[in-house]
């Protein structure tokens, strides 16, 4: 049984795959925050900007089997050209639910499988693109992948600690919220002073897509 908040077709708005057409499969639940506002300040991740609670989003629900969920994702793919299909498994924390059987069903339908994870749970074999976004001082198990995205700034977190990890791309993303303008200035300054890092923006918010 898979609990899914929403499934929708859009453009990837962040990171090295920015601009690529994708079906987003947002799983319900997270191991770093309940999703309830009354728990935010005490959560291991208190700056999340995503609603991952429940199954009431577009195409959300309880999916009984890997094939039923993969079919629901496939139905959202609107392109009929020869481009490789792409599904982004996100959350919440997708690795609480994503497993090898579901990955195999996605592959059977011609999808590359990407995940956006906090890195606290090992990645199943078969995932094609791994994006890890460390949160605060939470221990990270996944120290290799395709890209590391650090929301910045985070109290007491020095980005340099991550540069020894095995990732192809390192992104600094300004923390959203009331201080987003200041955080953007700080992120730009940091990237100019530390050019191994690239500035990562949430372009889907800039252009007004989901």
Residue ranges and their predicted role:
Residues 28-30, 135:
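Short loop segments at secondary-structure junctions
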Residues 82-86, 94-210:
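Conserved AdoMet/S-adenosylmethionine-binding subsite of the radical SAM
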């Amino acid at each position: 049984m898979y609990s899914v908040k929403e499934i929708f077709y859009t453009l990837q708005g962040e990171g090295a795959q920015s601009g690529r057409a994708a079906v987003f499969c947002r799983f319900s639940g997270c191991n770093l925050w309940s999703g309830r506002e009354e728990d935010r300040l005490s959560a291991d991740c208190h700056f999340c900007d995503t609603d991952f609670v429940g199954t009431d989003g577009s195409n959300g629900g309880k999916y009984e089997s890997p094939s039923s969920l993969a079919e629901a994702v496939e139905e959202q793919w609107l392109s009929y050209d020869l481009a490789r299909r792409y599904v982004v498994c996100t959350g919440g924390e997708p690795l609480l639910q994503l497993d090898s059987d579901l990955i195999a069903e996605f592959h059977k339908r011609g999808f590359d499988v990407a995940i956006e994870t906090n890195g606290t749970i090992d990645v199943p074999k078969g995932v094609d693109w791994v994006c890890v976004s460390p949160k605060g001082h939470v221990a990270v198990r996944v120290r290799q992948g395709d890209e590391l995205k650090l929301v910045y700034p985070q109290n007491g977190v020095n980005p340099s600690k991550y540069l020894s990890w095995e990732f192809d791309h390192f992104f600094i993303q300004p923390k959203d919220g009331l201080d987003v303008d200041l955080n953007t200035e700080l992120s730009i300054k940091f990237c100019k002073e530390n050019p191994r890092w690239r500035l990562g923006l949430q372009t889907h918010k800039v252009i007004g897509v989901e």
